């Protein structure tokens, strides 16, 4: 890689009020490390905190509602417990000098009822389920 390219990559970047320490972004990766109630865990704070040298971290897909939590152990933000559990994650990233943003993910027809919280319903624009398991 050209030296001028790498020197630009690692320079701070500002867009509006957002100031990043560099121009590196970590793309979201669904890791399924939340607990059974879709509450973020300590291991998630450690994972994201150790990657905070990227200018911007984008979290794994996070369900905004129980009806969108179609994968087991993906984090959510629909309960007070989930919102509170995200605070140590964001603190770990911010304390290490990084910035973090959430990727909202509603699984729609990819959902499987067995992976959803009790009482949740598959909601999607189509009643046709995806083929396969």
Model region roles, listed by residue range:
Residues 29-43, 71-80, 109-113:
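Active-site mouth loops of central-metabolism enzymes
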Residues 26, 51, 93, 102:
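Conserved, mostly hydrophobic/aromatic
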Residues 74-101:
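Alpha-helix-loop-beta-strand connector modules within alpha/beta enzyme cores
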Residues 23-25, 56-58, 99-101:
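Structural preference for beta-strand elements that scaffold enzyme active sites
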Residues 1-16, 24, 28-46:
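An N-cap/entry alpha-helix motif that binds or orients negatively charged groups
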Residues 44-65:
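Catalytic domains of carbohydrate-active enzymes, especially glycoside hydrolases
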Residues 28, 61, 104-106:
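A cross-domain feature marking catalytic cores of carbohydrate-active enzymes
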Residues 105-133:
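Non-globular sequence segments
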């Amino acid at each position: 890689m050209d030296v001028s390219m790498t020197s630009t990559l690692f320079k701070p970047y500002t867009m509006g009020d957002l100031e990043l320490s560099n121009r590196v972004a970590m793309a979201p990766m669904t890791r399924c490390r939340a607990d059974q109630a879709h509450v973020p865990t300590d291991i998630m704070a450690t994972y994201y905190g150790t990657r905070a040298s990227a200018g911007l971290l984008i979290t794994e897909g996070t369900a905004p509602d129980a009806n969108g939590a179609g994968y087991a152990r993906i984090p959510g933000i629909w309960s007070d417990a989930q919102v509170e559990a995200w605070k140590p994650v964001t603190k770990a990233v911010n304390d290490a000098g990084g910035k973090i943003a959430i990727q909202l993910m509603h699984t729609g027809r990819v959902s499987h009822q067995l992976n959803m919280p009790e009482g949740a319903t598959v909601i999607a624009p189509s009643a046709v389920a995806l083929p396969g398991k």
